[in-house]
A protein has these predicted regions:
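Conserved glycine-rich cofactor-binding loop
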Residues: 8, 15-17
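Residue(s) in the substrate-gating loop at a strand-loop-helix junction
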Residues: 142
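Conserved glycine-rich Rossmann-like NAD(P)H-binding loop of the short-chain dehydrogenase/reductase
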Residues: 29-46
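The beta1-alpha1 cofactor-binding region of Rossmann-like NAD(H)/NADP(H)-dependent oxidoreductases
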Residues: 40, 61-72, 105
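SDR active-site lid
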Residues: 175-239
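Active-site helix of classical SDR
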Residues: 123, 158
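Conserved mid-core segment of classical short-chain dehydrogenase/reductases
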Residues: 94-109, 151-154
Length: 273
């Protein structure tokens, strides 16, 4: 029997990308799903498809940057299912702009609110229920949560913050049976980059990543599901990601150079489009 059979699972950022695909994978394994995002029409679309796999699904339209909305997610889940077994903090937004070019620094505050505080708020309200169920907490971060990347200052800061928070929380929860799994994807074929915030604070409307460097969302989600099921401490995707972790310790300047060249290469790719 699947580890997710009748597992009450909350997925934030479930209307597209990794969150959407994860909803389908867990629905197929018998999970009872609570899907949340801001766009109600997209949530309904995802929920309808998830139900075709026989899953029980409820949706909650919410902005995870708001504490009250996160409390609503948890309260709705408890009212519907009576418990929480897994919390997947997946909601996020990104950026493509050098810090010196940013017109209004408040855009970084919004990124931090969504990516970091959204995870903190949801975890705060869900934690008593997760302790009761000896459940799972999952933070979907990014390889930019492990290294610095130019043009991603605000995004990298938010993902580094997620890592610090969840790594610390894991230690606090070690004796109560709640696992904390951190996920570090590289570039994945989702819409997050096309909706990235540019220097002017508006969506950039272009994906600057060479398609040859992108992992499919299906492959990414397969890895995530296995990591959640195994209650792994962390899952660093791609060979480059794993190598980067070690190089950062022994040759941080090399990693800085690799990150710089990668961004410059992506810029040349955009110029050819």
């Amino acid at each position: 029997m699947s580890a997710f059979q009748n597992n009450v699972t909350i997925i934030t950022g479930a209307s597209t990308g990794i969150g959407e695909e994860l909803a389908y994978r867990l629905a197929q394994q018998g999970a009872m799903l609570v899907l949340t995002a801001r766009r109600l029409d997209e949530l309904n679309r995802v929920a309808d498809k998830a139900r075709t796999f026989g899953a029980k699904v409820i949706i909650v339209s919410a902005d995870v940057a708001k504490s009250d909305d996160c409390k609503k997610i948890i309260d709705t889940t408890i009212n519907a299912f009576g418990r929480i077994d897994t919390l997947v903090c997946n909601a996020g937004m990104t950026m493509w702009a050098k810090f010196a070019d940013i017109k209004d620094v408040s855009m970084l505050e919004r990124i931090m609110q969504v990516n970091y505080m959204g995870a903190v708020y949801c975890t705060h309200y869900a934690l008593p229920h997760l302790i009761a169920s000896k459940g799972r907490i999952v933070g979907v971060a990014s390889l930019t949560g492990l290294i610095g990347v130019p043009t991603r200052t605000g995004y990298a800061a938010s993902k580094h913050a997620m890592r610090g928070f969840f790594d610390s929380l894991r230690i606090e929860l070690a004796d109560v049976g709640v696992s904390v799994t951190m996920i570090y994807p590289g570039f994945v074929a989702t819409g997050i980059r096309e909706n990235a915030t540019g220097a002017d604070g508006k969506p950039a409307k272009i994906d600057p990543v060479n398609k040859d460097d992108v992992m499919s969302v299906a492959e990414c989600t397969d890895i995530i599901v296995r990591a959640i099921e195994a209650r792994k401490r962390e899952e660093i995707m791609t060979v480059k990601g794993k190598l980067g972790q070690w190089l950062k310790l022994i040759a941080p300047g090399v990693i800085d150079g690799m990150a710089k060249r990668a961004v410059e290469g992506n810029q040349k790719y955009v110029e050819r489009l």
